[in-house]
Amino acid sequence: MRTYGVFGPPQEFPGMQKLFDALNHRFDADLGPPAETIDETATLKSMAARRSHRRFKPEQLSIELLQMLCATALSAPSKSDLQARDIVIVRDKAKHARLAEMVGQEWIPSAPELLVFCGNNKRQRQIHEWRQKPFENDHLDAFFNPAVDAGIAMQAFVTAAESIGLGCCPISGIRNNCDVASEVLELPEHVFPVVGLGVGWPVASGHVSVRLPLEATVHVDTFKDDAIAEQVEAYDNRRYAIHHAANQRQVERFGEVAKYTWSEDKARQYASPERADFGAFVKSKGFLLK
């Protein structure tokens, strides 16, 4: 039986069985209930079994529902309570269409709702002007904190939305051409797009993406990756047996392989530059990144 340093062996605990079934399937693990008493597991079950959705019913959500979900998302942690993140709800059809065209993923035009989570360092600088205090943190952290804050808010939105039955799919491709996204959304200096999100009532459930084993990604006290090559190989084999990509990347450059695994896909993906101009865009927004 497999064990993990911080996790004990599985135990009999029928009320949490679905949660641990989902976790153990995703991570190929033998996790069991903790010693602590946990009465409510609905959110945990939803998160453990989550999957991205790219097919939706056509109807839009009410603005009231979107505002409720945004408020819930913005209740998530924020570095030093700086609240350096904003959400743009894209309801204008022309803007939606232009962003979808820029990203280039065929499912996005049919997503009923498109949101863009932005990092915002402008507001902090404005506060310094209003309070007549010098802004002495014009370095990498001025960009990094809003970027992380926006990512946290996006994940909180996903958790909230999926808890009521909505489906979501994050869109990193919103950064494929940040100049276009910034123009469409009229983002000022020191405000930048971090991630998009397609949202709607799902019509089909996507597959659950199994993850790397916890031995590879959860560490106790010290980071260790002595066995990472073997762990990735085992993960490749398991993932390929469950679900693997239908299309191979860059066949003209790397050819076709009989067994197209996760690591092969990721190696091919990052064998070509992606968003190499993102740093220049961020600097054009007024960030020094020093």
Describe every region a protein language model picked out.
Residues R2-K290:
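Acidic, surface-exposed loops and disordered segments
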